[in-house]
Amino acid sequence: MRSRSNGMGKIVGIDLGTTNSVIAVLEGGKPVVIANAEGSRTTPSVVAFGKDGERLVGQLARRQAVLNPQNTFYAVKRFIGREYSELTAESKRVPYTIRRDESGKVRIKCPRLQREFAPEEISAMVLRKLVEDASRYLGEPVTDAVITVPAYFNDSQRQATRDAGRIAGLNVRRIINEPTAAALAYGLDRQQEQTILVFDLGGGTFDVSILEVGDGVFEVKATSGDTQLGGNDFDKLIVDWLAEDFLAKEGIDLRRDRQSLQRLTDAAEKAKIELSGLLETNIDLPFVTATAEGPKHIETTLSRRQFEDLSQGLLQRLRYPVEQALMDAHLTPSQIDAVVLVGGATRMPMVQDLVRQMIGREPKQNVNPDEVVAVGAAIQAGILAGDVKDILLLDVTPLSLGVETIGGVTKVLIPRNTTIPVRRSDIFSTSENNQSQVEIHVVQGERELAAHNKSLGRFKLTGIPPAPRGVPQIQVSFDLDANGLLQVVALDRFSGREQSVVIQGASTLSEEEIQQMLLDAESNAAGDRQRRARIEKRNRSQDLINRAERQLREAAQEFGYQFAAEQRRGIEALVRQLQEAIRNEDDRQIDLTYAALEERLYDFIRQLRLREEEAEDDEEVFKLPNLREAVNKGLDVVRGRERRRDDDEDEWAEPPRTRRSRSYSQRADSAPWDDWDDDW
């Protein structure tokens, strides 16, 4: 997918998910999901640091989570772009440690490295893994991307996602809402006009968007959601059910132990997935803890009915955003033409039943809920690169944007569900006589009081000429771009003085922090490349050892152990040296011995080939197959006589021991070719 305008390389589409992430690209005008290095089309959004400080991302990180809970980080998307004070108690209940720094931001503690990470840094590591795998697949470096976010992400969370992309070394060309991306994937080839409801229940977030799709136009009419509701919350219901039952029986709260909590979390996720296809599932956790009486185990059964009863509160929370989106779009459920389910959590039968009940329509099952968002992001990337034509995407802002006025009241400039990009302005004045400056406090949310909304930032306009209160005219303009990122301009219409700011959000990173994290990421990437190179070097060395041993073994079977004896001894010595260098992790010695063994093995194989060619010439000259046949016939006669003589002996008697075995150096193919002699 090359941009025709600037000759740039591929632009990829990335679904940066709470639980799993996916990367896709347009090839030949069609979106293709790129498998990772492990061969999977989805990559767990998990980062871990092993015992030697090595960084693990994806499935490798997830596998060791139970044994390394404090240094394994998942569901970080729930923390990105948020202040510590905004986090719920549930979101903070993870096996690793999250804390508040001096400025109120979220920090993730890594005991293994004795340092702390911002959520953006952890997300950047997942992005870098996706991009490196995509670069290997495409055969060229990937530098540009479209990244999706939940539709209900506020400005801070969007900016933080963009920062994560920058830390990963990406030029983030566009931030696009996940439901909108899903609608792009679903409606790309559909010409008839339809009203689509996208129900997006991911691992940690929930969005509902309503779009009108037809003739290449994708117009978002309304969006709603809950950024603290997702499939992980259903897992936690099972965790609590298991933990409370164990607490009642044994008096031990497993949630207080990090390793036990991780085991409960893994078992809960597994049970949730199984209950999508089964009516009940067994949960077995041996040695989950121990007391003075000995080890303790969990052995229980959870039915789908029990799980649904546990989930009633969460199902009720899913209802409100659907109702709100329908209300904002001025539509009834009967006016929805299609329902598209997005996110792995929508596989739960009770969620699908809820959608059927609320909309009165069967959800579409012809899209992959795990991949459809990344596919839509790849289509948006194709639009930006000029590879996809005649597509117009009209998205909306999910939350109202405004400023704080006298008394702490919010004055909305851009209402929620306004089509973006958009520019709106309003006139304000001073609240005191001879006021020389005003502070602009930008907020986002639906509450009447600014203190109850999300603070996005503050800046001051100074140099206002002295005048009675209410006389100066201060024009405040909001410019919201297609990425959902906001620029605010304040202008004194009398003096012409102007002050502008790109809202970074109160809980996102400063430019200095981003640059430092980018340097750290590049440094870590270099270390990762070095570790990978060492691993590949050892793998190549072991392959060479295996090849050398195989060649020696085959040569001995064909020509005997005396064949090229001096070269054989040299190869065996080099094999031992290389094995020792691998054990000692001596990179220089590995390189030297590898080269020497490779050269010695090449000479040995060349000599072996010459010997094989000589053997083939001998067989052609002396008609060896006929000779062998004659020898075998003669032996058959001798054996026949021996068998007739032995018929009179006891059949249980010990066999004669006088038969001579083949000499150690005799060629295997010089023995008679019949089954009778196989035991010798």
From Swiss-Prot:
Modification sites for Phosphothreonine: T205
SUPFAM superfamilies listed in its UniProt record? Actin-like ATPase domain, Heat shock protein 70kD (HSP70), C-terminal subdomain, Heat shock protein 70kD (HSP70), peptide-binding domain
Q: Which residues cross the membrane?
A: none
Does Nucleotide-binding appear among the keywords? yes
UniProt xrefs under InterPro entries: ATPase_NBD, Chaperone_DnaK, Heat_shock_70_CS, HSP70_C_sf, HSP70_peptide-bd_sf, Hsp_70_fam
Q: Where is this region: Disordered?
A: 640-680
Q: What induces it?
A: By stress conditions e.g. heat shock.
For the keyword Transmembrane helix, the answer is no
Its biological purpose: Acts as a chaperone.
Q: What is this protein called?
A: Chaperone protein dnaK3
Q: Which organism is it from?
A: Thermosynechococcus vestitus (strain NIES-2133 / IAM M-273 / BP-1)
